């Protein structure tokens, strides 16, 4: 298939203007000994043939499995308008808006996105998005090192273990240290977290709801952290923010999380987006792109990329971070998702998630030998204790087309019987009842 | 244009949330409940659709305008690959991490593995990881791999990374994120990193050299193999920034030339759309000796032909949650499969032809600081126009009025008043001729009526925006 439009006649005309005899002559600056030793790829094909291959791969993608799994990524409704509007080519085939006059669409949308994130998190300043939830937590950790000029972060181990691994890796090269504090059951051990803060602690990082599904109040932790000159970073799950007190209300200094659940499909791992928001006084330490409001030469309101002096194209190795792009299109989807639901719908969605999970909790704990491990409130995830190892049970249920949850043992050694179950608004009562029946069957046999 | 919040009417409903089919739970505890509702806009679906449709019309894009944004490679995004990328929307990435879950997701796992193999062959590397989520994320991952390699060998004194002054700003920033100090080498009169100064800077404290070739001036560095050899001799590794790979598909493989690590920007070379600033995707390829240090997990092909997710215990750990920006990877895989060997070679040939055509036709009016055959992009300077008080930015804004997205201006930093043009392979001679005519016209207006260029753009919804005011006011969300 030829996407290159120029005809042989046109190529000849162009070569004549250049003064070259052939296209190959244009590659003359490349010494012969540096030429490719191999380029062993199959020949191209038609669209039809390609789509046949791609459909085969997608068909073996597990989309038919009923997911009661989260692990930071959630199966939520996506209003049709999200797909339609974000599929407009003027949005998806544009680049980073370096020329604001011909990029007001992207820039205003990102300004609106930043506003939505501030309102969700109870913060005053948001950037235009980061890569994903895990790297967002890592960037927040680095941000706290810059602000406090300290080199140690306290990491609550009830944070998503995939995210913890990313944070540890990011800190490693910088000779900064991440100290993990084990949870107390399925909740953060607030006392030990507070005791772990010392003069070198830049931040305490917690997640709400945490990886086990527990919702907690971190207001006191915020006060104690601030007393010792440390920051509080709360990683969160944006759908929960329709119901749960925001990081801002709890006194956090930085709020982060994965925005996937706001209108971005599962897509086997991405693209998603990370969000990060903070207090206005820390804005110069925010990594990544930021859109700001201003006026044009005739006093009309408009939007530009701002505070670019923090960024790598100007500051190079002294930049606040190496992040050069954001996840603009995914953030746009998040914005349209939130605007679609609106104030009332967003809260209703959160309540629905809570109600469905509470129903599942009562059904599943009705199964003999099964109990809930979370001590207090949960949102749409909760952790069960099974009367036997969770991993083989999950494997057995997968064969019936149900992903019953995430067995915790691979992330929390010793928690062999623990299973974290996720219930979103998309899971029907019938699916929840079937999960309970299958679980009962698997435990009896 | 009003903000969506300004169109909000209290009580107006948007999309309906599904009805509950379960009993109402006892209320969520007040102590943990948010005090203020989330003040999201209250609009009807039509309000919403009109708002974002009209916003989109305030954007230039590849599908609506010629977008010769140098070094960012804004090429046409094939439509069938968009369809292909959307096929995987329902696949949950945690499935293969569950016991017995791998067999349910053989399709997407085979795609991860397949793309890794395609990219390894294209770049001349031995293995590739798709985990990094953007080009700069790939750079950081690559440098972390290099750091792990030196550390595993007990080589602790290496604390510098060398970059040329024409490098993308992300190169030094990424190396700094991985804990290195940066040594910058100036550009020689022949348009690339000064070989003598490079030799002087190289010693056993250097961990890596980061380069791109062709470089950001669009020039192929004839000394590239020598630079790699010198680095290797001192025990340093070589990093190839794949931002400019579109110029050399099938012509040069960085792995053959002597590079140890590479990242590729799928949105640049492999036609995945950049969405107004992302998502991108930045897979990293390495030579054999570095495979152990790649991030975990890895998708491996087993003896029976099936695909498995395996931990990679010596690796640098996770750099993203799962397997990278999968739906972007699926588009790139589809693009490579669709074009095939000959199609990809044609891409580079036409990208180079088009860039040289524009360079040849504009060099009479615009200063060409490095007058050599270029690769996929060419860099002019507006220094002649500056004599009449016209800056590169004025020419850029005039192009907007004439319906063209401006080229990259003021980059690379080592060219004064730089104008960097990258047409890409998918533009026709007719489109380029129109663009060239407007560029020549801008040069004429610069001589005859420079004020006219200072006023541009006048056709856009807003005129030149006050960036200083934006930075001072720091108004980044609507109150």
Swiss-Prot record, chain A:
Keywords: Oxidoreductase. InterPro entries: GcvPA, GDC-P_N, GDC_P, PyrdxlP-dep_Trfase, PyrdxlP-dep_Trfase_major, PyrdxlP-dep_Trfase_small. Its EC number is 1.4.4.2. GO terms for biological process: glycine decarboxylation via glycine cleavage system; nucleoside metabolic process. It holds the Pfam family GDC-P. Gene3D superfamilies: Aspartate Aminotransferase, domain 1, Type I PLP-dependent aspartate aminotransferase-like (Major domain). It is an enzyme of class 1 (oxidoreductase). One of its GO terms (molecular function) is glycine dehydrogenase (decarboxylating) activity. It catalyses: N(6)-[(R)-lipoyl]-L-lysyl-[glycine-cleavage complex H protein] + glycine + H(+) = N(6)-[(R)-S(8)-aminomethyldihydrolipoyl]-L-lysyl-[glycine-cleavage complex H protein] + CO2. Belongs to the GcvP family. N-terminal subunit subfamily. The glycine cleavage system is composed of four proteins: P, T, L and H. In this organism, the P 'protein' is a heterodimer of two subunits. The glycine cleavage system catalyzes the degradation of glycine. The P protein binds the alpha-amino group of glycine through its pyridoxal phosphate cofactor; CO(2) is released and the remaining methylamine moiety is then transferred to the lipoamide cofactor of the H protein. NCBIfam families: PRK00451.1. This is Probable glycine dehydrogenase (decarboxylating) subunit 1. It comes from Citrifermentans bemidjiense (strain ATCC BAA-1014 / DSM 16622 / JCM 12645 / Bem) (Geobacter bemidjiensis). The lineage of its organism: Bacteria, Pseudomonadati, Thermodesulfobacteriota, Desulfuromonadia, Geobacterales. The gene is gcvPA.
């Amino acid at each position: 298939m030829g996407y290159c439009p120029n005809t042989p006649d046109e190529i000849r005309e162009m070569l004549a203007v250049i003064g070259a005899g052939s296209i190959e002559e244009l590659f003359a600056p490349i010494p012969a000994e540096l030429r490719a030793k191999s380029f062993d790829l199959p020949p191209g094909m038609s669209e039809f043939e390609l789509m046949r291959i791609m459909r085969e791969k997608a068909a073996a993608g597990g989309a038919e499995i009923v997911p009661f799994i989260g692990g930071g990524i959630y199966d939520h409704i996506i209003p049709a308008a999200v797909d339609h509007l974000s599929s407009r080519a003027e949005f998806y085939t544009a680049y980073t808006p370096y020329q604001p006059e011909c990029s007001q669409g992207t820039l205003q949308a990102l300004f609106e996105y930043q506003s939505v994130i501030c309102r969700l998190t109870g913060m005053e300043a948001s950037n235009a998005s980061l890569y994903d939830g895990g790297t967002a937590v890592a960037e927040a950790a680095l941000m706290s090192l810059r602000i406090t000029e300290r080199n140690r972060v306290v990491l609550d181990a009830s944070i998503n273990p995939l995210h913890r691994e990313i944070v540890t890796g990011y800190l490693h090269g910088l000779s900064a240290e991440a100290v993990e504090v084990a949870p107390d059951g399925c909740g953060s051990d607030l006392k030990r977290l507070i005791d772990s803060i010392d003069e070198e602690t830049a931040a305490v990082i917690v997640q709400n709801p945490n990886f086990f599904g527990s919702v907690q109040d971190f207001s006191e932790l915020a006060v104690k952290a601030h007393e010792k000159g440390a920051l509080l970073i709360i990683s969160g799950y944006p759908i929960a923010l329709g119901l749960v007190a925001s990081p801002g209300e709890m006194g956090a200094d930085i709020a982060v999380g994965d925005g996937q659940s706001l209108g971005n499909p599962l897509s086997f791992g991405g693209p998603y987006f990370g969000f990060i928001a903070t207090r206005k006084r820390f804005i110069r330490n925010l990594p990544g792109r930021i859109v700001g409001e201003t006026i044009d030469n005739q006093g009309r309101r408009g939007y530009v990329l701002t505070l670019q002096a923090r960024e790598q194209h100007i500051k190079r190795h002294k930049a606040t971070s190496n992040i050069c792009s954001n996840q603009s299109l995914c953030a746009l989807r998040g914005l349209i998702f939130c605007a679609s639901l609106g104030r009332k719908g967003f809260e209703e969605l959160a309540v629905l998630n809570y109600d469905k999970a509470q129903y599942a909790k009562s059904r599943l704990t009705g199964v003999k030998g099964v109990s809930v491990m979370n001590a207090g409130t949960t949102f749409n995830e909760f952790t069960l204790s099974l009367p036997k190892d969770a991993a083989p049970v999950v494997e057995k249920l997968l064969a019936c087309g149900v992903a019953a949850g995430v067995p915790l043992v691979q992330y929390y050694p010793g928690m062999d019987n623990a299973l974290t179950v996720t219930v979103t608004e998309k899971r029907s009562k019938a699916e929840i009842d079937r999960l309970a029946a299958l679980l009962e069957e698997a435990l009896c046999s | 244009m009003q903000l969506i919040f300004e169109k909000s009417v209290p009580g107006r409903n948007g999309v309906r949330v599904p009805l509950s089919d379960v009993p109402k739970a006892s209320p969520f505890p007040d102590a943990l409940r948010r005090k203020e509702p989330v003040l999201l806009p209250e609009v009807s679906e039509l309000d919403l659709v009109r708002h974002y449709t009209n916003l989109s019309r305030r954007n230039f894009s590849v599908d609506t305008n010629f977008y010769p944004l140098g070094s960012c490679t804004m090429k046409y995004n094939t439509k069938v690959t968009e369809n292909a990328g959307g096929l995987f929307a329902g696949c949950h990435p945690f499935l293969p991490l569950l016991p017995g879950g791998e067999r349910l997701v053989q399709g997407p796992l085979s795609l991860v593995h397949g793309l890794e193999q395609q990219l390894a062959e294209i770049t001349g590397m031995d293995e590739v990881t798709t985990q990094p989520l953007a080009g700069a994320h790939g750079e950081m991952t690559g440098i972390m791999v290099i750091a792990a390699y030196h550390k595993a060998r007990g080589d602790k004194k290496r604390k510098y990374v060398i970059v040329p002054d024409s490098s993308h700003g992300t190169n030094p920033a990424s190396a700094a994120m991985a804990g290195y100090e940066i040594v910058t080498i100036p550009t020689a009169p022949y348009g690339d990193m000064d070989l003598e100064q490079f030799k002087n800077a190289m010693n056993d404290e250097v961990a890596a050299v980061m380069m791109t070739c062709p470089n950001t001036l669009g020039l192929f560095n004839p000394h590239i193999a020598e630079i790699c050899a010198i680095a290797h001799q001192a025990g340093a590794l070589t990093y190839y920034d794949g931002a400019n790979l579109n110029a050399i598909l099938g012509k040069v493989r960085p792995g053959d030339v002597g590079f140890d690590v590479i990242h590729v920007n799928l949105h640049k070379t492999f036609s995945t759309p950049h969405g107004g600033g992302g998502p991108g995707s930045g897979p990293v390829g390495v030579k054999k000796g570095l495979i152990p240090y790649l991030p975990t997990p890895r998708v491996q092909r087993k003896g029976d032909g099936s695909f498995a997710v395996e931990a990679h215990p010596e690796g640098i750990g996770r750099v993203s949650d799962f397997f990278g920006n999968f739906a972007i990877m699926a588009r790139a895989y589809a693009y490579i499969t669709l074009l095939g060997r000959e199609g990809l070679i044609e891409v580079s040939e036409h990208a180079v032809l088009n860039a040289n055509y524009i360079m040849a036709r504009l060099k009479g009016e615009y200063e060409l600081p490095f007058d050599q055959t270029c690769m996929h992009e060419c860099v002019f300077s507006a220094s002649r126009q500056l004599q009449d008080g016209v800056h590169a930015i004025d020419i850029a804004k005039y192009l907007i009025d004439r319906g063209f997205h401006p080229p990259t201006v003021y980059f690379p930093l080592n060219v004064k008043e730089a104008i960097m043009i990258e047409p890409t392979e998918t533009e026709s001679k007719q489109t380029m001729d129109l663009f060239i005519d407007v560029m020549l016209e801008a040069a004429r207006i610069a001589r005859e009526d420079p004020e006219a260029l200072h006023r541009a753009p006048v056709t856009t919804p807003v005129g030149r925006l006050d960036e200083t005011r934006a930075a001072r006011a720091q108004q980044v969300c609507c109150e």
